[in-house]
Amino acid sequence: MEDYIKIEKIGEGTYGVVYKGRHRTTGQIVAMKKIRLESEEEGVPSTAIREISLLKELRHPNIVSLQDVLMQDSRLYLIFEFLSMDLKKYLDSIPPGQFMDSSLVKSYLYQILQGIVFCHSRRVLHRDLKPQNLLIDDKGTIKLADFGLARAFGIPIRVYTHEVVTLWYRSPEVLLGSARYSTPVDIWSIGTIFAELATKKPLFHGDSEIDQLFRIFRALGTPNNEVWPEVESLQDYKNTFPKWKPGSLASHVKNLDENGLDLLSKMLVYDPAKRISGKMALKHPYFDDLDNQIKKM
């Protein structure tokens, strides 16, 4: 830790305090995440350290790079590249009545998908994607932060400040208690973020797991074994769920064109096996008119 100087506290993440810091010799500005674990006495589990060490190898222009993993007083510090703005702050800064430029929505979505495809190809899931952990710079680049931390540390129910971890971007298979889930959980999250890029509003903003599920069901219809084989046997599925009929996504997401809505609907398919993959999403006609500079990144 002696290599880094803490400059100021910049936020509170899912796992602990985040500081802006500086490397003593190079002067490089970094983000320092202090990981606060549930069981402080036992120190950091070796499995977590193994998992985290693997993340140093995830090098991609759309992934926030993990530069160092340090221990101090049995606390774990993760040293990341520094970006000052996250997508939530950016969306909140857009004046009322105005929206993000549609070409920027497209560019950000494409970059998010590129980052996710890279990680999925290395068998790393994110599991907790949300606007707060998508970081942006002033050159139009967006990067995914906190990759792989969910697997290393688990996703707590509450942030250590007692703020509840958001459910708004969580996939239906996770909400319904599926024990086996894979890369489609991240695609669902990206779909909900895509809608929010277009409208500035969360697509499904539930305040409990059941409220979250019912908001999804009201928009997309209550799933059954016909549309999603075996959904009725998932741990938290109840036959007593109200049977809503599918509505139209267009009524919830007014600022997307036909191709955008088509891609969104493919990302929000109930059956994870039928949900579009990141790789296929990148080939969708929605991106046909995207600037080639972005496609080459």
From Swiss-Prot:
One of its GO terms (cellular component) is mitochondrial matrix. Pfam families: Pkinase (PF00069). Plays a key role in the control of the eukaryotic cell cycle by modulating the centrosome cycle as well as mitotic onset; promotes G2-M transition via association with multiple interphase cyclins. The lineage of its organism: Eukaryota, Metazoa, Chordata, Craniata, Vertebrata. It comes from Rattus norvegicus. InterPro entries: CDK (IPR050108), Kinase-like_dom_sf (IPR011009), Prot_kinase_dom (IPR000719), Protein_kinase_ATP_BS (IPR017441), Ser/Thr_kinase_AS (IPR008271). The modification N6-succinyllysine is found at K245. Its EC number is 2.7.11.22, 2.7.11.23. The modification Phosphoserine is found at S39, S178, S248. It catalyses: L-seryl-[protein] + ATP = O-phospho-L-seryl-[protein] + ADP + H(+); L-threonyl-[protein] + ATP = O-phospho-L-threonyl-[protein] + ADP + H(+); [DNA-directed RNA polymerase] + ATP = phospho-[DNA-directed RNA polymerase] + ADP + H(+). PROSITE patterns: PROTEIN_KINASE_ATP, PROTEIN_KINASE_DOM, PROTEIN_KINASE_ST. Belongs to the protein kinase superfamily. CMGC Ser/Thr protein kinase family. CDC2/CDKX subfamily. GO terms for molecular function: ATP binding; chromatin binding; cyclin binding; cyclin-dependent protein kinase activity; cyclin-dependent protein serine/threonine kinase activity; histone kinase activity; Hsp70 protein binding; kinase activity. Keywords: Acetylation, Apoptosis, ATP-binding, Biological rhythms, Cell cycle, Cell division, Cytoplasm, Cytoskeleton, Isopeptide bond, Kinase, Mitochondrion, Mitosis, Nucleotide-binding, Nucleus, Phosphoprotein, Serine/threonine-protein kinase, Transferase, Ubl conjugation. The modification Phosphotyrosine is found at Y4, Y15, Y19, Y77. It is an enzyme of class 2 (transferase). There is a cross-link at K6, K9, K20, K139 (Glycyl lysine isopeptide (Lys-Gly) (interchain with G-Cter in SUMO2)). It is found in: Nucleus; Cytoplasm; Mitochondrion; Cytoplasm, Cytoskeleton, Microtubule organizing center, Centrosome. The modification Phosphothreonine is found at T14, T141, T161, T222. The active site is at D128. Phosphorylation at Thr-161 by CAK/CDK7 activates kinase activity. Phosphorylation at Thr-14 and Tyr-15 by PKMYT1 prevents nuclear translocation. Phosphorylation at Tyr-15 by WEE1 and WEE2 inhibits the protein kinase activity and acts as a negative regulator of entry into mitosis (G2 to M transition). Phosphorylation by PKMYT1 and WEE1 takes place during mitosis to keep CDK1-cyclin-B complexes inactive until the end of G2. By the end of G2, PKMYT1 and WEE1 are inactivated, but CDC25A and CDC25B are activated. This is Cyclin-dependent kinase 1. ATP binds at I10, G11, E12, G13, T14, Y15, G16, V17, V18, K33.
